[in-house]
């Protein structure tokens, strides 16, 4: 049954060319929202926009001027902006090898009862550029999006924002200091913004997905994926549809009493 409780609402979703973002776009469109699809890849943005009968707005979320212009264009065109989902992100690709090294060391430790793991060199070899890019895409991108949208929502005195963090923002992992730091920052930022905007009728929440079956997991080896699944209580990766249902709940009237909250969906990974 098609629930039309989002009928007439306008949603802006970053990183929606594939994976979680595309699932969010489809789910909100299913319930009547008009979706503006952002992605760094113009073709990916246009593909999702075509599927959900929305419009594409391709740009790099680390470009604050581009973000401001995009939100201004949406408001000028529709006269409102109801929903922002800050989803754009990049995987800790550069640390996939050190993730595997950490797992290998843990296995060695269990097998030989070694009391100390060998030191990891991922942090000392992490470049300024890799650190900066990770922080800028996740944390700066979320800030730029919220700042631009809140200028509109402040005038409207309504709106909902969902910032996508990660379980690694709650429980940091070896080999992902830059990713964990960025995602933890999103959690703190979300709580602060929610406190500032609640009196305006604006709700701001964060979602911390666990390991979800998306292209972001492509860099991980079979060894890494096997180790991850063994730690998930449910015994499998999550699906984009499961996270999309949670996000749909948070942008709708069903969650009208929720703001400043962090919702974890990890299958029991960090229980």
Which residues does each predicted region cover?
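Alpha-helical segment proximal to the catalytic Tyr-Lys
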Residues: 151, 195-196, 256
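Residue(s) in the substrate-gating loop at a strand-loop-helix junction
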Residues: 166
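Active-site helix of classical SDR
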Residues: 146, 182, 190
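Canonical Rossmann dinucleotide-binding motif of NAD(H)/NADP(H)-dependent dehydrogenases/reductases
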Residues: 4-36, 193
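Short, small/polar-rich loop/turn modules that mediate ligand/substrate recognition or access, typified
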Residues: 198, 203, 233, 258-260
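Catalytic Tyr-X3-Lys loop
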Residues: 90, 101-143, 158, 162, ...
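C-terminal substrate-recognition "lid" of short-chain dehydrogenase/reductases
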Residues: 158, 236-270
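The beta1-alpha1 cofactor-binding region of Rossmann-like NAD(H)/NADP(H)-dependent oxidoreductases
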Residues: 42-43, 58-71, 90, 128, ...
